[in-house]
Curated annotation (Swiss-Prot):
Sites bearing N6-(pyridoxal phosphate)lysine, chain numbering: 242
Alphabetical list of Pfam families matching this protein: Aminotran_1_2 (PF00155)
Annotated function: Catalyzes the decarboxylative condensation of pimeloyl-[acyl-carrier protein] and L-alanine to produce 8-amino-7-oxononanoate (AON), [acyl-carrier protein], and carbon dioxide.
Name used for this protein in its record: 8-amino-7-oxononanoate synthase
Pathway: Cofactor biosynthesis; biotin biosynthesis
Keyword Coiled coil found: no
């Protein structure tokens, strides 16, 4: 029997994505100035970045990177366990661990690599299970599959559902994993309830707070805002590529867990360390995030303004008090049409479609930054309301005439 033709398969899959409105072409950014971006030759006001505190272009952060690169070079030159672990890596790990109240931290090149490392190193035996929120980030879900562990999912934010799933998997070691702030909905996991579930079911509780640290509560993220610490959440992921404006991630945890990851996690062992200059930039960003409460205060005010203006215009908001503000569109084509109409008016907002979100839940994902102004927020909401009307009119005009009604 002939093998399937991979080229024919990918062409068929691409044609299907075209028909569904799910193509994802890359956009080329040539220049940035705060929240203004030149994209494919057009200047747009962006509301789709994860640079929540506006630190990616902060002068002192950029200066820290440049100074460290001039001293230490462009790269680490080796993995952490050979000769790539630099004093700047060590300083960053200690600073973040101290900030969030954990004994130790371990630096990774990305959040995806960190999530894979945690599950590959800890869920290593037959019958091990990872119970997860149905809407967890793809990196958490994929990590379970790639680690070879069993994956069980519970309904979104449902701590009782998590308990049921753990009870149905009594054999093998167990991990309960959740996002802290959910990247597509912007809501926050019920961490206190989930922590109790993990304790009762003898499961290791792991929180990926990529979108919470720097923003939620006093800046220490969703775990601290829930009044929890290392005794409740033995492992926590912090990313450097969201509120902290850089790239990379850290896993924070108990001494024994972090030591085990450093010695056995393949994504940590078999990759070159993050450039020391990037660690220097992240270190400065962490210090600013800890010190400059005005950034969070301004961001909180902008979130409240956006939601107030959106309600005034009758937009379909979701329950989020974080910088992630999704506006449901329903079908994929409407989301793309809305995003395109906004771009034509000078605004850059991403259309998020399956498989990133569930079927029928396509949306505009608006993300706010401390760099935005109230005028920009009001202008965006007005543009969204106008785009909604234009797209709805186009849909009505394209619809076939109604069938005649016979008595």
């Amino acid at each position: 029997m002939a093998r399937p033709d991979l080229t024919a398969r990918l062409h068929a899959q691409r044609a299907l994505r075209d028909a569904q409105g799910r193509r994802r072409p890359r956009r080329t950014v040539t220049r940035r100035d705060g929240v203004r971006l030149e994209v494919d030759g057009q200047w747009l006001t962006g509301f789709c970045s994860n640079d929540y505190l506006g630190l990616a272009q902060q002068f002192s952060v950029v200066n820290a990177l440049q100074d460290a690169a001039a001293r230490e070079g462009a790269g680490a030159g080796a993995s952490h366990l050979v000769c790539g672990h630099h004093a700047l890596h060590e300083a960053l790990e200690r600073e973040v661990a101290e900030w969030l109240g954990y004994p130790r931290a371990l630096l990774f090149g990305s959040g995806f690599a960190a999530n894979l490392a945690v599950q590959q190193a800890l869920l290593s035996e037959e019958n091990d299970v990872c119970v997860q929120d149905k809407l967890n980030h793809a990196s958490l879900l994929d990590a379970t599959r790639l680690a070879g562990a069993r994956l069980r999912r519970y309904p979104h934010l449902d701590a009782e559902g998590a308990m049921r799933q753990l009870k149905h998997a009594p054999d093998g070691a167990a991990m309960l994993a959740t996002d802290g702030v959910f990247s597509m909905d912007g809501d926050i996991a019920p961490l206190r309830a989930l922590s109790l579930v993990a304790r009762l079911q003898q499961a290791l509780f792991y929180v990926d707070d990529a979108h919470g640290v720097g923003v939620v509560g006093d800046g220490r993220g969703a775990v601290a805002a829930a009044g929890l610490g290392v005794d409740d959440v033995p492992l926590q992921l912090v990313t450097l590529g969201k509120a902290l404006g850089g790239s990379g991630a850290l896993v924070l945890g108990r001494d024994d867990l972090i030591e085990h990851l450093a010695e056995t996690a393949r994504p940590y062992i078999y990759t070159t360390a993050v450039p020391p200059a990037m660690a220097a930039a992240a270190l400065e960003a962490v210090r600013l995030a800890r010190r400059d409460n005005w950034r969070r205060s301004k961001l909180t005010d902008l979130i409240a303004l956006f939601r107030s203006e959106a309600r005034r215009h009758g937009l379909d908001l979701m329950a989020s008090d974080t910088p992630i503000q999704p506006l449901l569109c329903g079908d994929d084509h409407t989301a793309v049409a809305m995003s395109t109409a906004l771009e034509q008016a000078g605004w850059l907002v991403g259309a998020i479609r399956p498989p990133t979100v569930p079927e029928g839940k396509a949306r505009l994902r608006v993300t706010l930054s401390a760099l935005h102004t109230p005028e920009q927020v009001r202008g965006l909401v007005e543009a969204i309301a106008s785009a909604r009307e234009r797209v709805a009119l186009a849909v009505r005009e394209a619809a076939p005439p109604p069938l005649p009604v016979f008595a």
